[in-house]
Amino acid sequence: ERLHWLCAAGGPATLPDPIALVAFPQGCQYRNRAIHALESAGRRWRIAYESPNLSGLQAAVEGGLGVALLEQRCQTPAMARCDALLPRPAPSELALCMSDTGSRAVHELARLIMDFCGDDKLRQAA
């Protein structure tokens, strides 16, 4: 699923400099992608709020503490997309590696993952 920049509903028409970022702790790929997108676009940023829990991030965004880069399904009614105000992050990539000697269950799981990732809805979201 494509990631979106989310802010509080009725949020600002422009964003502050530096960008107030709401993010998961260091090591999270969403955080890394948000920072990379901002830095690649020459935008300054600061961590305004950090939480290991999605509900904590959602509450911070809803409360207007900053913006977060999250999946669309994480958007609550109290949030709005602000993609037009911020740089688009690089698309997601997924690599699936398995051994030919894997069990039947491993091969079935791999097939399910490939079918899911090959879904037209996912291609359109990216």
Where are the model-predicted features located?
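Hydrophobic/proline-rich hinge and linker segments of small-molecule sensing/allosteric domains
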Residues: 1-26, 93-101
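Short active-site alpha-helical segment characteristic of glycosyltransferases
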Residues: 56
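Conserved beta-strand segments of alpha/beta enzyme cores
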Residues: 4, 20, 44-47, 80
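A late-sequence structural motif
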Residues: 85-125
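Short, structured loop/turn "capping" segments at alpha-beta junctions
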Residues: 13-15, 43-46
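Beta-alpha-beta core module
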Residues: 1, 59-101
